[in-house]
């Protein structure tokens, strides 16, 4: 179970309009950069973008997750997973869970409901690596 450390590099939250809106759709995207190997760990950049329709507010969070495997076997498995070009689902959930309090606070300050839906997992469920925060 690898250890995860997070670094938030940038937070931007902006409200464009204060008009009353009957229906508000909130879209959230989590995007990951290409993993970098550093000594015995991996560095993976991420960007979380939250936008509203109609456009009345937006939130952007940029950061980095540092994944430190406990064993050489975990390091090898993670390296293979990243070579496939996919981000492990437990890592997506860990990034979302870490940033959810920040997103909730910013949403409250902007006066919009927080996007609390968990990211969807692909239909294939593979046995993988569990992560520890």
Predicted regions and their residues:
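N-terminal intrinsically disordered, cationic/polar leader segments
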Residues: 1-94, 104, 108-133
């Amino acid at each position: 179970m690898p250890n995860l450390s997070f670094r938030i590099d940038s937070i931007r939250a902006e409200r464009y309009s204060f008009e009353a809106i009957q229906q508000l759709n909130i879209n959230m995207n989590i995007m990951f950069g290409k993993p970098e190997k550093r000594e015995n760990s991996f560095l993976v950049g991420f960007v979380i973008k939250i936008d509203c329709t109609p456009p009345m507010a937006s939130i952007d969070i940029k950061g980095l997750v540092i994944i430190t495997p406990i064993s050489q076997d975990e390091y090898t498995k993670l390296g293979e997973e990243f070579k496939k070009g996919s981000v492990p689902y437990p890592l997506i959930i860990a990034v979302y869970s870490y940033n959810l309090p920040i997103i909730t606070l910013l949403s409250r300050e902007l006066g919009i409901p927080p996007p609390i839906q968990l990211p969807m997992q692909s239909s294939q469920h593979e046995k993988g690596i569990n992560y520890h925060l």
